[in-house]
A protein has these predicted regions:
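Short helix-initiation/N-cap motifs at beta->coil->alpha
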Residues: 18, 33-44, 87, 104-107, ...
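Ligand-binding cleft/hinge of the Venus flytrap
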Residues: 5-9, 21-30, 92, 105-125, ...
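Extracytoplasmic small-molecule ligand-binding "clamshell" domains
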Residues: 1-57
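Beta->alpha turn/N-cap motifs
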Residues: 1-2, 35-40, 49-61, 76, ...
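Hydrophobic/proline-rich hinge and linker segments of small-molecule sensing/allosteric domains
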Residues: 1, 69-91, 104, 173-177
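Periplasmic-binding protein-like
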Residues: 75-82, 127, 145, 149-191, ...
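A ligand-binding cleft/hinge motif common to bilobed small-molecule-binding domains
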Residues: 41-44, 56-66, 111-114, 134, ...
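Extended ligand-binding regions for polar small-molecule ligands
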Residues: 18-27, 86, 93, 99, ...
Length: 208
C-alpha cells in the first residue's frame, strides 16, 4: 500500500505502478498478476522465483543492482513533510536534532540516518509515519515525492511538503539477477511506452 503508486482499494489493487505494469504486460503479450508482499522481503522473494518482477517505487542503488536487474521507469526526489503549524525545514541539514519518521529499509531511512543528531524512528508501513506526524510524535517525515504530494493534496490541514532531500533519483522495476531476456523485453516495452506518449498519459491520470 503506497498511494498513489499502488494500494488495495476494497480488494482491488490499483495505482500508477499497476497501470504501468499492466501496459508493459500487454505489450509483452501476457497478463500481469499482482500480489502484495512486505517491503523488506521483496528482493528475497524475487531471488527465489516467488514472482517475476517487482514494481514498488524502488530506488535504483548500487546495492540493489548487486541483488537484482533493474529497469528505470521514473525519477523523483525525496521530500520533507511537516505539519503546517511547524517551522518549515527545507533541507536535510536543517533536520539536525529533530525527530524523523521513515519507512524501514528505504532510501528515506538512509537519508534520515545521515542527519546529525536526528532521532530516527523506522516503521514497517509508510502510513504509520504520517500517523506519527499527525499525532505530534515526530517533527518530520522523509518520503518519496509522489506520496508526499498525494497526502498534501488529501489532507492539506495536516501535511505540507516543506523541502527536498537529496537529488532526483531513478526508480526501477526489479527483475531476478541474471534474468536478462525478461529485463531486455521490459526495457524495450518501457522505451516504447515513453516514446508513444502512453507513459505521460498514465502519469497524468494519477498525478495531475
Amino acid at each position: 500500500t503506497y498511494p498513489p503508486l499502488e494500494w488495495n482499494d476494497n480488494g482491488t489493487i490499483k495505482g500508477y505502478d499497476i497501470d504501468l505494469m499492466d501496459e508493459i504486460a500487454s505489450r509483452l503479450g501476457v497478463e500481469a498478476e499482482f500480489m502484495s508482499i512486505k517491503w523488506d522481503g521483496l528482493l528475497t522473494g524475487l531471488s527465489v522465483n516467488q514472482y517475476d518482477a517487482v514494481i514498488s517505487s524502488m530506488n535504483i542503488t548500487p546495492g540493489r543492482l548487486e541483488e537484482a536487474n533493474l529497469v528505470e521507469y521514473m525519477q523523483w526526489l525525496q521530500v520533507i513533510v511537516m505539519s503546517p503549524d511547524a517551522n518549515p525545514v527545507s533541507t536535510l541539514e536543517e533536520l539536525e536534532g529533530k525527530r524523523i519518521a521513515v519507512q524501514v529499509s528505504t532510501t528515506s531511512e538512509e537519508m534520515a540516518n545521515s542527519v546529525k543528531d536526528a532521532q530516527v524512528s523506522s516503521f514497517e508501513s509508510f502510513d504509520t509515519t504520517f500517523m506519527e506526524l499527525k499525532n505530534g510524535r515526530c517533527d518530520a517525515i522523509i518520503i518519496d515525492e509522489p506520496v508526499g504530494m498525494y497526502y498534501q493534496k488529501l489532507e492539506p490541514s495536516l501535511f505540507v511538503i516543506t523541502g527536498t532531500a537529496g537529488e532526483r533519483a531513478p526508480v526501477g522495476i526489479a527483475l531476478k539477477k541474471g534474468a536478462n531476456a525478461l529485463t531486455d523485453a521490459i526495457q524495450e516495452a518501457m522505451d516504447d511506452i515513453k516514446a508513444d506518449g502512453t507513459a505521460d498519459r498514465i502519469y497524468d491520470k494519477w498525478f495531475k
